[in-house]
Amino acid sequence: MATSVATLSSPPPVSLPLLSSSRSSFFSNCFTVTTRPNTRSLVAIGRRIRQEPTRKPLTCNALFGLGVPELAVIAGVAALLFGPKKLPEIGKSIGKTVKSFQQAAKEFESELKTEPEESVAESSQVATSNKEEEKKTEVSSSSKENV
């Protein structure tokens, strides 16, 4: 019987092609993937690329982070669903609802601002009224016991 000894050696370093071009405006860093000489693990090595200053396109994130194209699609679907005759009515009702929510929020905020000032005065009044009520109940209960 012959015994043989097999040794495992690590594969040579592998350099994978980059997934993005260096001029791409979407990626800010380029990474290459290589293997370490004595291990079998992959390591990402980052390189910083100096980007030329570019102009950002005009964007409008007006409603819940939605852009103009998304809002246009939503408006188109709404026009198809409700028709051109009902859209003004729906717009008016949505506007009234939003206005009422804004008004309620302002009232709530004003109540919160005035509440601390009034709460100090009310707490002293409530404390005195509670004491008066306790005295009245004690007097009425004692008068019932006497009868």
Curated annotation (Swiss-Prot):
Q: How does it sit in the membrane?
A: Single-pass membrane protein
The residue ranges for the Lumenal side of the membrane come to 60-61
Can you quote a single GO CC term? Answer: chloroplast envelope
Q: Give GO BP annotations, semicolon-separated.
A: protein homooligomerization; protein transport by the Tat complex; protein transport within lipid bilayer
- Would the keyword Aminoacyl-tRNA synthetase turn up in this protein's UniProt record? no
Stretches that traverse the bilayer = 62-82
Q: Where is this region: Disordered?
A: 109-147
**Which keywords describe this protein according to UniProt?**
Chloroplast, Membrane, Plastid, Protein transport, Thylakoid, Transit peptide, Translocation, Transmembrane, Transmembrane helix, Transport
Q: Where in the cell is it found?
A: Plastid, Chloroplast thylakoid membrane
Q: Which InterPro entries match?
A: TatA/B/E, TatA/E
Q: What is its main location?
A: plastid
Topological domains (Stromal): residue ranges?
83-147
**What does this protein's UniProt record list under function?**
Part of the twin-arginine translocation (Tat) system that transports large folded proteins containing a characteristic twin-arginine motif in their signal peptide across the thylakoid membrane. Involved in delta pH-dependent protein transport required for chloroplast development, especially thylakoid membrane formation. TATC and TATB mediate precursor recognition, whereas TATA facilitates translocation.
Q: Which family is this sequence assigned to?
A: Belongs to the TatA/E family.
Q: What's the subunit arrangement here?
A: In thylakoid membranes, TATC and TATB form a large receptor complex, containing about eight TATC-TATB pairs, which binds the precursor protein. Twin arginine signal peptide promotes pH-triggered docking of TATA oligomers to TATC-TATB receptor complex, inducing a conformational switch of TATA that results in activation of the translocase. TATA dissociates from TATC-TATB upon completion of translocation.
Q: Which protein, by its recorded name, is this?
A: Sec-independent protein translocase protein TATA, chloroplastic
What does the organism's lineage look like at the top?
A: Eukaryota, Viridiplantae, Streptophyta, Embryophyta, Tracheophyta
